[in-house]
Amino acid sequence: EYDDAHTFRSGTYFDEIYHARTAYEMIHDLYNYENTHPPLGKIFISLGIRIFGMNPFGWRIIGTLFGIGMLPFLYLFGKRLFHQTWVAGVVTTLFAFDFMHFTQTRIATIDVYGTFFIMAMFYFMLRYAQTSFYDTEFKKTLIPLFLSGLMMGLGCASKWTAVYAAA
C-alpha cells in the first residue's frame, strides 16, 4: 500500500525545493524563484523533468548520471597520476561508496554538476601538465588546456564554488 505522506520518495528533499522548482519554472518560462547560482545545473535538472515529468525521479536522474560519470573521470585521473591501475581502481571504488558522493548524487542539488566539471577540469589540467612539449606538436598540447578551461567554465556556470577550484 502506498503512503501519500511527504517523503523523499514523493516530494522534495533539502535544496531540491529550490532547484527542482526553478528547473520547472525554466521549462515553463516562469519567473525563476532561485537565482543565487548560475543556471546550468538547473538546466540539467530540467532535462530530467522534461523527459520523466515533474516527479522525484525526473528531477534526480540527471544528477545521478553525472555522479556515475564522475567515476570514470576519477579512475582516469588516478591512473594518470599514480601510473598504476590497481591504485586507480581502489580510489574509484572508495569514491563510489563514499556516503557524501552517494547522497549528493541521489538528490536534485546543483553540487553534483559543479563537482563533475571540477573533476574534469583537474583531469585535463593534469594531462596538460604531463604533456611532453618536446615530443608533441604545439597545437596538440593546447587541447587538454582548452578542455580544462571549458570544464572550468561549465563548472562556474553550474555553481559558483567552481571558481574556487579554478583559483
PLM feature spans:
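Short acidic/glycine- and proline-prone juxtamembrane loop motifs at membrane-interface regions
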Residues: 100-113
